[in-house]
């Protein structure tokens, strides 16, 4: 049973931040897929608040409390599901370690592992994420490029 889409932090930010360059694209994607359910997890929620409240992100960055309020407003959507971090990073590495090449893939690796575990898909705009899986792997079906 498919359990929907885990939004990576970039998709989550683009969804909630109208000035984001991919806001329209993500909104269109969500209009087609929201009924299948979309999810966040502690990692993506924390990263959302951290990034949205960073002045380097935008001259209009929010205070952390306001960023958390924006997050809460979005995860209040009826199609949203919360996925707990049910896996240790070592459990994810059992499957994905052979393809993990650099420090910038660590978070992506965990999110992909969580999506696979939940029988959902990781929704991302990062075209490199499928490379965490072997080229002809059926598990590449767990990645949804937005």
Predicted features, each with a name:
Residues 1-40, 52-69, 137:
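Short, well-structured N-terminal submotif of metal-dependent ribonuclease cores
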Residues 7, 106-107:
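A generic structural signal for residues located within well-ordered alpha-helices
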Residues 33, 74-75, 115:
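A generic structural signal for well-ordered alpha-helical segments
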Residues 88-101, 109-146:
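Acidic, PIN/NYN-like endoribonuclease modules and their adjacent C-terminal/linker elements
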